[in-house]
């Protein structure tokens, strides 16, 4: 917590090809060691592959995948009287998007394909069809929140 007032959130610029801020966030999350060109190439190649594979607009597939991966609830550890409870909380829209992108890339990274753009395209395709590891992660998170519903009154 800063002592000198509130820190303004920096807004990302929309990407040049699809004019979308979410795609920019995806590219920024793919990026390693400041190599944005490589990250853009991975992202755009994945989108190109999706276009070939599905015949649909890649942004439609991406948005469908994101909607299927973004969590509505999550659990947060809260310590009360020597016991730690997993308290279910609602996820803010900004964090929903961030978690969705993070889980999507983590799931893509664990896939068996040789190249990252194929891994990402495969995971996006799976997620848009409501299957895949990223969607499973969301379902597990929701299940955990549902199981700990009794502790919801400890919310903060």
Swiss-Prot record:
Single Gene Ontology MF annotation: structural constituent of ribosome
One GO BP annotation of this record: translation
Top-level taxon of origin: Bacteria
Protein function: One of the primary rRNA binding proteins, it binds directly to 16S rRNA where it nucleates assembly of the head domain of the 30S subunit. Is located at the subunit interface close to the decoding center, probably blocks exit of the E-site tRNA.
NCBIfam families hit by this protein: rpsG_bact (TIGR01029)
Keyword annotations from UniProtKB, A to Z: Ribonucleoprotein, Ribosomal protein, RNA-binding, rRNA-binding, tRNA-binding
Protein name as annotated: Small ribosomal subunit protein uS7
UniProt subunit comment: Part of the 30S ribosomal subunit. Contacts proteins S9 and S11.
GO CC, alphabetical: small ribosomal subunit
Record Gene3D superfamilies: Ribosomal protein S7 domain (1.10.455.10)
Protein family according to the UniProt entry: Belongs to the universal ribosomal protein uS7 family.
Disulfide bonds: none
Keyword check for Iron-sulfur: no
């Amino acid at each position: 917590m800063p002592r000198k007032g509130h820190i303004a959130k920096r807004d990302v610029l929309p990407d040049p090809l699809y004019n979308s801020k979410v795609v920019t966030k995806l590219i920024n999350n793919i990026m390693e060691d400041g190599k944005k060109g490589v990250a853009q190439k991975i992202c755009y190649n994945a989108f190109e592959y999706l276009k070939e594979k599905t015949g649909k607009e890649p942004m439609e597939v991406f948005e469908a995948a994101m909607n299927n991966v973004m969590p509505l609830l999550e659990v947060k550890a809260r310590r009360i009287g020597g016991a730690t409870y997993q308290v279910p909380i609602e996820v803010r829209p900004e964090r929903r998007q961030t978690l969705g992108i993070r889980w999507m890339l983590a799931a893509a990274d664990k896939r068996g394909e040789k190249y990252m753009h194929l891994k990402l395209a495969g995971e996006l395709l799976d997620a848009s069809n409501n299957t895949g590891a990223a969607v499973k992660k969301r379902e597990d998170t929701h299940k955990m929140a549902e199981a700990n519903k009794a502790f919801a009154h400890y919310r903060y």
